[in-house]
A protein has these predicted regions:
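Well-ordered beta-strand scaffold positions
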Residues: 25-27, 58, 66
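Ligand-binding loop in jelly-roll beta-barrel domains
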Residues: 80-106
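Short strand-connecting beta-turns/loops that link adjacent beta-strands
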Residues: 25-27, 47, 91-92
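Conserved short histidine dyad/triad with adjacent acidic residue
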Residues: 30-45
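Glycine- and acidic-residue-biased ligand/ion/polar-headgroup-sensing regions
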Residues: 47-49, 54-59
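Histidine-centered metal-chelating micro-motifs
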Residues: 39-41, 60, 76, 80-86
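Short acidic-glycine-tyrosine-enriched beta hairpin
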Residues: 65-80
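A short, N-terminal "cap"/entry segment at the start of jelly-roll beta-barrel domains
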Residues: 1-28, 108-121
């Protein structure tokens, strides 16, 4: 058992990206923040499933080529091997929770030839 305040951790890119509160041994738990117009590389996981819960703001999450606009209070579950791309097309930062399980040290497969420009506004 442990208790942690999110302020004890830092976002990967200063004011954005994931902030992992827990990495393993069975799951990853992160608070994720994207600034306006910021995105994250299209990718998939071979083993892990990923879940996002939107804490504040609005974000577009593209799963297997279908764009889903999510807002505060929305939840999305992404299965292994589903290519997903996250982009904040809006004027306010987005803050969400990300949970990945089962924990894998390396399970992110970036999709290099993905046409992400079609999903940017």
């Amino acid at each position: 058992m442990f208790i942690l305040n999110e302020n004890e951790k830092e976002y990967r890119f200063g004011d954005s990206g994931p902030k992992y509160l827990m990495k393993g041994p069975r799951a990853n738990f992160a608070v994720v923040q994207f600034q306006p117009k910021q995105d994250f590389d299209p990718h998939y996981h071979e083993i892990m499933e990923e879940n996002f819960f939107i804490l504040s703001g609005k974000v577009d999450i593209v799963v297997d080529g279908v764009c889903h606009t999510l807002k505060t209070g929305d939840f999305i579950h992404i299965e292994p091997n589903e290519v997903h791309y996250v982009v904040n097309n809006y004027d306010e930062p987005i803050k969400m929770v990300s949970v990945l399980a089962p924990f894998q040290q390396q399970d992110k497969c970036v999709v290099e030839d993905y046409n992400k420009e079609q999903f940017k506004k």
